[in-house]
């Protein structure tokens, strides 16, 4: 039985919103929360009415990172248990987010530290409130980021900037996060969910298979050698050739009219 509040899930107008819901713990990612996020993602992947997912937090934090108090027992039990319970779980979540076939947009409403920052890194798109802050404070606890942050952050912002954040634990504000490429845009706190929904609406108007193909091409390609990445791009292009939407898109272009996509 879960004793802590679980993430909230709402679905409307083709958009799923997952809200981390442990505000008193700054939405720290304990085992139960991670497991429930994975269940939600499994559920939403097969729901054809859902075109995109918005991930946000309640209270003043997006997520302050791993629930260290809860993970302490795993760490105390030694490397094998810590790797099984903590690292594989956390990396499994961020890998699931990164490779998800539908867009997941991080709507960063406040602190995104440690594992919370790693979740943002894994999301293909991110919008931050102007009050948000980002940090990699794991070094102050004696370990490196374990949820994929040592690999994704350098790919996003460059090796030197990433190492400065990882080795110092210093935080950056939302404007700096946008400048270095950690988030796409910064808006006021009041406009955060409005901006996230607007981005979802723009993407949802595009052909669903093509959106999924673009996500797969970029995510898988950026982690591959160029020849392998080009093969991924070609295979994803082939996915779209058999769809109705590609023919509709080409006809609409030739006829100089807006396309009417069906997701087929």
Locations of the language-model features?
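Conserved CoA-thioester-binding segment of acyl-CoA-metabolizing enzymes
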Residues: 1-58, 81, 92-95
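Crotonase-fold acyl-CoA enzyme core
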Residues: 2, 95-211, 238-243, 247-248, ...
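Terminal peptide-recognition signature
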Residues: 18, 22, 36-37, 55, ...
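A short, glycine- and basic residue-enriched loop/turn
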Residues: 23-26, 59-60, 65-68, 111, ...
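Hydrophobic alpha-helical membrane-association signature
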Residues: 33-36, 86-89, 192, 233
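Glycine- (often His-adjacent) and acidic-residue-rich active-site loop
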Residues: 57-95, 112, 142, 225
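Short, charged, surface-exposed hinge/linker loops at domain edges
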Residues: 215-224
């Amino acid at each position: 039985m879960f004793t802590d509040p679980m993430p909230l899930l709402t679905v409307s107008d083709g958009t799923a919103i997952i809200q981390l819901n442990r505000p008193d713990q700054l939405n720290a990612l304990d085992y139960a929360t991670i497991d429930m996020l994975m269940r939600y993602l499994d559920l939403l992947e097969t729901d054809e009415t859902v075109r995109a997912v918005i991930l946000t937090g309640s209270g003043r934090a997006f997520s302050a990172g791993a629930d260290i108090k809860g993970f302490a027992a795993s760490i105390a039990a030694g490397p094998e248990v810590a790797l099984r319970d903590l690292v594989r779980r956390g990396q499994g979540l961020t890998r699931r987010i990164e490779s998800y076939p539908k867009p997941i947009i991080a709507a960063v409403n406040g602190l995104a530290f440690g594992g919370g920052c790693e979740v943002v890194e894994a999301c293909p798109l991110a919008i931050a409130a102007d009050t948000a802050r980002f940090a990699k404070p794991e070094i102050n606890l004696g370990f490196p980021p374990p949820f994929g942050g040592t690999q994704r952050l350098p790919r996003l912002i460059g090796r030197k900037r990433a190492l400065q954040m990882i080795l110092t634990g210093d935080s950056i504000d939302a404007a700096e996060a946008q400048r270095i490429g950690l988030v796409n845009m910064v808006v006021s706190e009041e406009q955060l969910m409005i901006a996230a929904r607007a981005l979802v609406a723009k993407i949802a108007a595009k052909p669903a298979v093509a959106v999924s193909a673009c996500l797969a091409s970029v995510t898988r390609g950026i982690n591959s050698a160029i020849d392998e990445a080009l093969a991924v791009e070609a295979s994803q292009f082939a996915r779209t050739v058999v769809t109705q939407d590609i023919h509709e898109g080409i006809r609409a272009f030739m006829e100089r009219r807006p396309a009417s996509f069906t997701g087929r």
